[in-house]
Amino acid sequence: MTINASNIENSFSKINSHFSKLTDYIWPIKRNEISKFLFITLLMFCILFIQNLIRALKDSIVTTMIGAETISFLKFWGVMPSAFLITVMYVKLVNRMKAENIFYLIISIFLIFFALFAYVIFPNHEILHLRPVTVHNLTTSLPNLKWFILLLSKWSFSLFYIIAELWPNVVFALLFWQFVNNITTVEESKRFYPLFGLLSQTGIYLAGHFLENLSKINYYITDKFALQSSFHTLSIQIILTIVLILGIVSIKTFWLLNHKVLDKKHMSLLRFKTKNKSITIAKSFQMILSSRHIRLIATLLICYGIAINLVEGPWKAAATKIYKTPTEYAAFIGSYLSYTGVFTIFFVLLGSNIVRRIGWFTSAVITPSIVFITGILFFAFNNFEGFAGLIIANFILTDPALVAITIGAIQNVLSKSSKYTLFDSTKEMAYVPLEPEIKISGKAAADVIGTKLGKSGSAFLQSLIFIILPSSSYQSISICLMIIFILTCLTWIWATKELNKEYKNSIKFSQK
């Protein structure tokens, strides 16, 4: 039997070819792109780790120390005006400062506030807030305004919630993605964007695991250094100290990207200014209204915000019945975040292949489909809690209220994990083929205002009900919320289909 050398060579060639394809399938990053990719991933990791810590902390403070119903008031009456103000400031800064300096300025403002809250404001909140007797007298005499009175009486908690709510959309959605979109081509975005989350989204799991063990960390530090501060004050200081450290790391990483990693071609893109240096916020909104592409992206963000907020309100209200202190609630949120991190990694691996192999639309429509299906399950159980509780009690020896919280948690885990990967990636890909002027001003308004309009629109409806009917609860208005939820999800799916057409047309136009 003779061995043909050419056949052996062909066999090895085929093996190498298949191995190369497998490697590209799993890790599509080219060798000369590794440093750029990893530094962006590190920056994303730090920003998202901070985002998850302050998100859990703001909910823990407000829901347990003011009341879950106040969240809807804060989102509309506090977060919404702040989002508009930030948009005005950003558009003006774009025409006056380098993109790099804008990043440093805004990040520094956030970090300074978090430091003040941790070490000055919260330890002295009893002195800074109105006395409980005064608050009680005011709420008794003005029952329809009781939630506004509570928010103003505990102004520092309300302010922290507003600032923490702005972080995801100002720092992550606007500053981070604006930077990445300017240094990434359409071809790179198809390989980079889905995989950014593979390493950076582990921050969700680690943040959750950290919060789950917050009590143990608290006890260890108290015993080690013989501290006399209150348990909850120390917990908040621990969380915000980690936030400050990661904030400094993110600033340093951003500096390295600008001065050590990116080449001159990328740096010239970052110094981009709009052709009209005196562009106003009115012109920015006019640009959005005249661009169907941007309008559809804003519609996706609005629908996501409304849909998630309609489910989160009743879920958080139910959770406070079991988890009554900020530390307990933070541990609960930590557990939820840990599962979100695991599922996020799964969706990252799935999403990377879907975007590259199947296309933009399939990836983009998965998130609204998941939100719709799981949301319907939650509302179905919530609206028929008594009947469902009897059935579950016969098969599962547990508290029906805990089952309701678990179903809501599953809904949030699946919705958020798909949002962080598939939704965010496809949304950012939709910006890439647009002209630079629309990318900057259009993205600023669409991301910040579009996101907050979604959350605040739903929040306004809920707060209005609580003002008109002070005795109403999330349980009593659940069916009404479910109907709005269904209509919102159907609109979301329609907008995704239409944006797919615009995205394809924009790519064809940009390649001419």
Swiss-Prot record:
Subcellular location, principal: membrane
Record's keyword annotation contains Plastid: no
Annotated transmembrane regions: 34-54, 71-91, 102-122, 157-177, 192-212, 231-251, 296-316, 330-350, 361-381, 390-410, 448-468, 476-496
Domain of life assignment: Bacteria
Alphabetical UniProt keywords: ATP-binding, Cell membrane, Membrane, Nucleotide-binding, Transmembrane, Transmembrane helix, Transport
GO terms of molecular function: ATP binding; ATP:ADP antiporter activity
InterPro entries per UniProt: ADP_ATP_car_bac_type
Pfam families named among the record's database cross-references: TLC
Gene Ontology CC: plasma membrane
Subcellular location: Cell membrane
Recorded topology in the membrane: Multi-pass membrane protein
PANTHER family found in the cross-reference section: ADP,ATP CARRIER PROTEIN 1 (PTHR31187:SF1), PTHR31187
Purpose of the protein: Provides the rickettsial cell with host ATP in exchange for rickettsial ADP. This is an obligate exchange system. This energy acquiring activity is an important component of rickettsial parasitism.
Similarity annotation: Belongs to the ADP/ATP translocase tlc family.
Record-given protein name: ADP,ATP carrier protein 4
Organism lineage: Bacteria, Pseudomonadati, Pseudomonadota, Alphaproteobacteria, Rickettsiales
